[in-house]
Every structure is written in structure tokens, then in C-alpha cells.
Regions:
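Residue-level signal for beta-strand positions within conserved beta-sheet cores that form or flank
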Residues: 130
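Noncatalytic nucleic-acid binding interfaces
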Residues: 134
């Protein structure tokens, strides 16, 4: 509840809520810069990231683990890759996943899961006509988006 505020600016997005007086003296760019200096991760990273194969949403980030929701579009797949610093655990919550792990293929349906150890070559593919949803739990000392060594990529990324 707000009392005695005649004019407010209210901006609501999926990952943030801004409520401020409609005052010409307030500099939004400067406020965001100040949040960046304090290492506020909401300023640095948007929770939903789009990729050629679909998207992922960061649900939770802590020091040694991170939880993401992956959406793999129909007939798409991620690159064949491995990670130097993290392990992953995938849980299928919607659809069917075709997972490659160290040259072996696993077909997973809803409520099935698989562990991807650090250093294992892996890929997930959605061969279906509907989106595939996976919850990914990453664990490790370093959880970096650029911790990817690609071996094959249909989208020609390095």
C-alpha cells in the first residue's frame, strides 16, 4: 500500500518490479549503474536467454549450484559439448528427450533423469513435434555460461 504519492511510475517485468515517484530529478540510468557496481545479478543477467535451439531460464543461482529450465524447440538439439568446471543433472518434465552421453544414447520421458558428470561429452535432442522441457541442476566450483567446449554444433557456433 502506498499513501500520499500522487504520481508514481510502476514498471513490472518477470524478474523485477520498479516503483518510483514521477520525478524529473531521478536518473534511471544512474540508478541501474549503481546496482551494477554492487554486483546485483539481476542487472547483469536476464533470467531468460534465447538460443537457436530454444531457451533457458535461470530459476535459482547459489555459490556452488544453479537451477535452470530448458525449453528445447521441436526438432532441435543443443551442441555436442562438455564442461570443464560443472556437472549437470537433467530431469524431463515435459516431452521426450534423446540424450547422448559419452557416445551412448538414452531416451528419456517425463519424470526420467540423467546425470552428466563434469567432462562428459553430451547433448540433448528433441525429436518430437512439441517443445521439450527439462529442469537442469548444475553443480561445481565455477558455474560459467562460457564453460562449454563444443565438438559438434548444427548452428555453427564455436
Amino acid at each position: 500500500m502506498v499513501i500520499n504519492k500522487k504520481y508514481l511510475i510502476i514498471i513490472s517485468t518477470k524478474d523485477a518490479l520498479l516503483v518510483m515517484p514521477n520525478d524529473k530529478n531521478i536518473n534511471i540510468k544512474e540508478s541501474i549503474k549503481n546496482l551494477s557496481k554492487k554486483n546485483n545479478e539481476k542487472v547483469q543477467y536476464h533470467p531468460t536467454v534465447y538460443r537457436p535451439w530454444g531457451s533457458f531460464e535461470i530459476l535459482l543461482t547459489k555459490k556452488n549450484y544453479q537451477v535452470k529450465k530448458l525449453i528445447i524447440n521441436p526438432k532441435q538439439k543443443i551442441s555436442l559439448q562438455k564442461h570443464k568446471y560443472r556437472s549437470e543433472h537433467w530431469i524431463v518434465v515435459k516431452g521426450r528427450a534423446c540424450v547422448t552421453k559419452n557416445n551412448k544414447t538414452y531416451n528419456l520421458k517425463k519424470n526420467h533423469s540423467i546425470d552428466i558428470p563434469k567432462g562428459a561429452k553430451h547433448r540433448v535432442e528433441n525429436k518430437e513435434k512439441t517443445p521439450l522441457t527439462i529442469i537442469e541442476i548444475q553443480t561445481g566450483d565455477k558455474l560459467l555460461e562460457n564453460d562449454i567446449i563444443r565438438f559438434e554444433d548444427v548452428y555453427n557456433r564455436n
